Structures are given as C-alpha cells and as structure tokens.
C-alpha cells in the first residue's frame, strides 16, 4: 500500500512539473496553430505557419502569442498529474492481471494512452475552450464586432459560464476525446516502441535509464507522427470549440462538421495548420516525456 502511495506521488509530481515546463515553452506555437486552423480555405490571411507567426508578432505584438496562457498554467498541473497517473496505472493494471507481455504490448500502450487522455480531458477541455477563444479573438471579432470581448483567461471563463453555462466550458468534449484519445494512444504506442528499440540497440533493459537525447528523439518522432495522423480530427475539434453557443452554429457535431468543411472547403481544409500542429506537439511532447522520465528517475529514490 505504501509503495502504491509513493508511486502515485511520484507520477503526480513528475507529470505536473514536466507538463508545466513544456506548455510554458510551446504555448506561442499553439496560438499560431489555432489561428491558422479556424481560417477557411480561400479566405486565409496567413500563407503558412511562419507567415502567421510573423504577422501576429508584427500586427499584435509578441505578448499576443501568450494569449490564454494563465489558464493553461493553472490547469496543466492537475491535468498532467491525472494524465500520467492514468497512463502508468492502466499499464500496471494490465500487467498485474495478464502478465508483463500484455502489459508491454502495443494495444495496452494505446489503451492506456486513451485512458490517460480521458482523465486529463476533464481539465483540458475547459482550459482549451478558454485558451482557444482568447487565441482567435482578433479573428472572430472582425467577423462579429458586437460579441463580448474577453479581457483575460479568468474573465473569459466567467463570461462563458454566464452566457453558455457549464456546457459552454465542455463544448466539444466528445470531439476533443475523439481527437486526443487516438492521438495519445498512437503517441504512447510509437514512443514505447522507439524506446524498446533503442534500448535493444544499446543492449539495455527496457526499464533501464536512457540518456536524454534518446528520450527527446523518441518523444519528438512519436509526437510528430501522431500529430500528422490526427490533424483532420483536430481541425474539426477546433472549429467546434471556438464557436459560441450565442451565435449561429455552423458546425453541429463531428460528422456534420466533417461534411460541412469537405463540401465548402475541400480536403485541403483538413490539413490546415498541420505544420503548426506538428511544431507545437512534437517538441512539446519531447520536452514533456523527457523531463517526465528524467524527474521520475531522479525522484524515485527521494519519495
């Protein structure tokens, strides 16, 4: 029982710390991703990821890249704690019941990743709603000058609750789970495979310590692959989440959004922002997982 408590504390501390570190560094790239993805094909003011970054800095200032960050900093600590706790315990649950072979299988890594995301999403989805509303505010205000202007993260949360209720904060929960559940499942499946392959090449046991460059490389590759594969789902999710319930609903769900986007904008719309998504997710995941593994290795003898 004591070991379980110690393990839980280890996963919570290392998960929370690693998540905050990565989000602090990668938030500006996420702002660019959100701005690019909400633009319709043929009506874009940005010519690509780096053009969007330059225009935002030029027209709105560097500080705009950190729009929505206060809510991210507040939410990422408990969200990442739940996320890594869910992943580690899901793997352990399978190992305890079906043996180490099943515990280290790809299907277990995928399933544990999905469970981890489902737990983290209880906090991440409201955070995402607030963050993305702030990130795209300049664009949406041009379309509807009469809508409420959010003065910051906590003001946005208050207004959303007042105007849309708790459902407003969980708008797009299922699309978010349908996007990030598979993403995290694919991510951990690829990451664990990379880790075991590298360990084998270095003649190490899978659970042995790997040097930081290998952890970063595995995390980056897994993140880039998973981000590219799930980009169409992310476009749909983002379009749904930035809608306000007080406005006309263009997108009424995942399937309706898919049909509407395909009909009005064509297949190209589903890869909008892929570059920004990869450059937000891949380095962010590399930083998160490498710092998580490092902190877990350092703290395990202290807790």
UniProtKB/Swiss-Prot annotation:
The keyword Mitochondrion applies. Keywords: Membrane, Mitochondrion, Mitochondrion inner membrane, Repeat, Transmembrane, Transmembrane helix, Transport. The chain crosses the membrane at residues 9-29, 68-88, 110-130, 172-192, 216-236, 269-289. It holds the Pfam family Mito_carr. Coiled coil: none annotated. SUPFAM superfamilies: Mitochondrial carrier. It is found in: Mitochondrion inner membrane. Residues 30-67, 131-171, 237-268 are mitochondrial matrix. InterPro entries: Mit_carrier, Mitochondrial_sb/sol_carrier, Mt_carrier_dom_sf. GO terms for cellular component: mitochondrial inner membrane. GO terms for molecular function: iron ion transmembrane transporter activity. Solcar repeats lie at residues 6-93, 104-197, 210-298. Residues 1-8, 89-109, 193-215, 290-303 are mitochondrial intermembrane. It is a multi-pass membrane protein. Mitochondrial solute carriers shuttle metabolites, nucleotides, and cofactors through the mitochondrial inner membrane. Belongs to the mitochondrial carrier (TC 2.A.29) family. This is Mitochondrial substrate carrier family protein E.
């Amino acid at each position: 029982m004591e070991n379980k408590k110690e393990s839980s504390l280890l996963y919570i501390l290392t998960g929370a710390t690693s998540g905050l570190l990565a989000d602090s560094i990668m938030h500006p790239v996420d702002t660019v991703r959100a701005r690019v993805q909400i633009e319709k094909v043929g009506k874009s003011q940005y010519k690509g990821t780096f053009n969007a970054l330059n225009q935002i800095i030029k027209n709105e200032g560097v500080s705009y890249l950190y729009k929505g960050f206060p809510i991210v900093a507040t939410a990422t600590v408990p969200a990442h704690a739940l996320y890594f706790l869910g992943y580690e315990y899901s793997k352990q649950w399978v190992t305890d019941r079906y043996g180490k072979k099943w515990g280290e299988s790809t299907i277990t890594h995928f399933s544990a990743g999905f469970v981890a995301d489902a737990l983290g999403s209880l906090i991440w989805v409201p955070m995402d709603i607030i963050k993305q509303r702030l990130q795209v505010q300049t664009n949406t205000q041009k379309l509807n000058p009469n809508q409420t202007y959010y003065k910051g993260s906590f003001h946005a949360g208050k207004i959303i609750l007042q105007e849309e209720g708790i459902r407003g904060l969980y708008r797009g929960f299922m699309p978010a789970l349908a996007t990030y559940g598979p993403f995290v499942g694919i991510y951990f499946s690829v990451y664990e495979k990379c880790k075991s392959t590298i360990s084998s090449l270095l003649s190490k046991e899978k659970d042995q310590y790997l040097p930081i460059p290998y952890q970063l490389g595995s995390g980056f590759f897994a993140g880039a692959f998973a981000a590219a594969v799930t980009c169409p789902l992310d476009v749909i999710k983002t379009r749904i989440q930035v809608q306000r319930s007080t406005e006309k609903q263009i997108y009424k769900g995942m399937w309706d959004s898919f049909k509407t986007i395909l009909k009005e904008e064509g297949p190209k719309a589903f890869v909008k922002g892929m570059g920004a998504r990869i450059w937000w997710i891949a380095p962010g995941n590399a930083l998160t997982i490498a710092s998580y593994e490092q902190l877990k290795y350092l703290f395990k003898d202290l807790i």
